[in-house]
Amino acid sequence: MSEELSKKHTTRLNKLQKRLRREVGSAIADYNMIEDGDRVMCCLSGGKDSYAMLDILMNLQQRAPIQFEIIAVNLDQKQPGFPEDILPAYLDKLKVPYHILEKDTYSIVKDKIPEGKTTCSLCSRLRRGTLYGFAQRIGATKIALGHHRDDIIETLFLNMFFGGKMKAMPPKLLSDDGANIVIRPLAYCREKDLEEYAQLKQFPIIPCNLCGSQENLKRAAVKDMLNQWDRQYPGRIETIFTAMQNTAPSQGVDREQFDFISLKRDPDVPMTGDVAEADLPAFDFLDIANSGHIDLDAAQRIDVVSFYEA
């Protein structure tokens, strides 16, 4: 690499690294993901996202005003051709404590899922169960997963389009049995930034298609839709994510989230008009004799059109 290219590479890496660290720090602070004394189990798949998560968390560990442990964990699911030496060599170099778990979930998935069908759903459930159980064994107080902002938004639309639910991936989650807290430190990070970061850092990526599973076509379609929006309408994806953080149950239609049944008007409220009219002169009657016009100051006159049955 020439000196000029090397300088550009370093400049871009530093800029991107700063942004990602800031976003991860903000997500952790906003959702209180990591606390003093935590033992964080960082789940590694060998993909770009989990590598970036471990890298950023290790940097944060050195700079944060609190003390917490990091234990990297990878689950070898016995997929054909899985390069067993890559992750141990990488983690040894980092000098981070780690565990490589071995469990043949691949055979279970191949036995249960018909040939040519997507295996990702069952595979992820089996993987989650194994990792949750191991977290309890090692006394982990938090389980860190590498899902990013795009994953969260895609999941929202997948559940809307195909599940009839307004449901995404929360940045912080208590497992159904109450035994584990799952955190997603990359919740504010864009996938394209993580892709570039992985290239610049030259992480030893392990391909995710070793199982031979077909691509999840529904998720791929949603991803394509969002990418098209991002190209055509810059800022739309950011607005969607902001909207997900600003929900108003009373303005929706979900009876489980808001008690519409018990809504009662307050007969004692003064007749001052609706909040939307707060900036307009208040009035409490219509001057029928004057064709519906109410005589106010000329500069503030309001025309009120009324219809009356004969």
Swiss-Prot record:
Subunit-structure text: Homodimer.
Which family does this protein fall into? Answer: Belongs to the TtcA family.
Taxonomic lineage of the native organism: Bacteria, Pseudomonadati, Pseudomonadota, Gammaproteobacteria, Alteromonadales
Q: Which organism is it from?
A: Shewanella sp. (strain W3-18-1)
Keywords of this entry: 4Fe-4S, ATP-binding, Cytoplasm, Iron, Iron-sulfur, Magnesium, Metal-binding, Nucleotide-binding, RNA-binding, Transferase, tRNA processing, tRNA-binding
Per the record, GO CC terms?
cytoplasm
Q: Under which name does UniProt file this protein? A: tRNA-cytidine(32) 2-sulfurtransferase
PANTHER family in the record? AMINOTRAN_5 DOMAIN-CONTAINING PROTEIN, SULFURTRANSFERASE-RELATED
What other comment is given for this protein?
Answer: The thiolation reaction likely consists of two steps: a first activation step by ATP to form an adenylated intermediate of the target base of tRNA, and a second nucleophilic substitution step of the sulfur (S) atom supplied by the hydrosulfide attached to the Fe-S cluster.
Q: Which Pfam families match?
A: ATP_bind_3
